[in-house]
């Protein structure tokens, strides 16, 4: 057995991204400017395809953005359970979009779940 003294340990169990085309009623793959969270994450990233500049696929800066929570979770047709990460991840993206564009950001959710110390304040 190997013993290692470390300050932090990260256990990454892995995950599989949800295919947003499984929820066609949101328009992913049908409407040009409907994105997955991972695609938005790449847009706001300085090393992303637009060097951190948040633009739509037609190259325009959005004036308003809608973020739909729980896509693929809490849904009888996909997964019935709450992932416990989507709300905070969506709120993080909302802050980043607002910071990068000044656009008005609207969050659409069943109910906001922020289970953690200081998380509810992040929502405000």
Regions found by a protein language model. Give the residues of each.
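Residues forming the flavin
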Residues: 1-124
């Amino acid at each position: 057995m190997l013993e290692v003294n470390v300050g932090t340990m990260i256990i990454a169990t892995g995950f599989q991204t949800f295919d947003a085309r499984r929820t066609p009623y949101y328009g992913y793959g049908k409407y040009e400017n409907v994105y997955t969270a991972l695609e938005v994450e790449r847009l706001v990233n300085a090393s992303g395809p637009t060097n951190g500049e948040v633009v739509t696929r037609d190259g325009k800066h959005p004036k308003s953005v809608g973020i739909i929570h729980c896509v693929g979770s809490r849904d009888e047709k996909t997964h019935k359970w709450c992932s416990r990460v989507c709300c905070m991840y969506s709120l993080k993206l909302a802050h980043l979009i607002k910071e990068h564009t000044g656009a008005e950001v609207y969050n659409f959710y069943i109910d906001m779940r922020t289970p953690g110390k200081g998380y509810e304040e992040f929502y405000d």
